Amino acid sequence: MMILNEILENNKKFVDEFEGEELSHHPQKKLAILTCMDCRLTGFLEPALGIGRGDAKIIKNAGNTIVGEDAIRSIAAAIFSLGAEEVLVIGHTECGMAGSDPDKLRNAMIERGIPQEEIDKVDLKSWIGGFEDEEENVI
């Protein structure tokens, strides 16, 4: 079974059984969190912080970095449109972005069929936002 079919099946079951409560779009703890998209944090970070559904705006990206405008846009929306008053930047150890190699990324992109001329339009070194030290990345 394709993973999409499995996901759709699980979603249907969830929706059929869901008895949800109405929640505000505004974070109840007035908190925004920028963190890493690492799949090991799923279902782990929020309980570790005592954050429940509706408590915080969780913004995830590769390496919990502010590279480009997307993270800033999400943080600004959380603060100025949705009432967040505090922002946490939370990293973790053994982050896959630490020491990331733009040349390896370029090669992987080419292997997947992305034309070199498209890759050359982006400064991969700054775009990938690699860092060497997880702790320094959040300080």
Language-model features: locations:
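Divalent-metal-activated hydrolytic enzyme cores
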Residues: 1-31, 64-71, 80-82, 97-139
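Short beta-strand segments
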Residues: 31, 34-36, 43-44, 60, 90-92
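Short, charged/polar surface micro-motifs in flexible loops or helix N-caps
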Residues: 38-40
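Short Gly/aromatic-enriched secondary-structure transition segments
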Residues: 46-52
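A short beta-strand-loop structural module common to alpha/beta enzyme folds
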Residues: 56-62
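Short acidic/polar active-site loop segments enriched in Thr and Asp
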Residues: 85
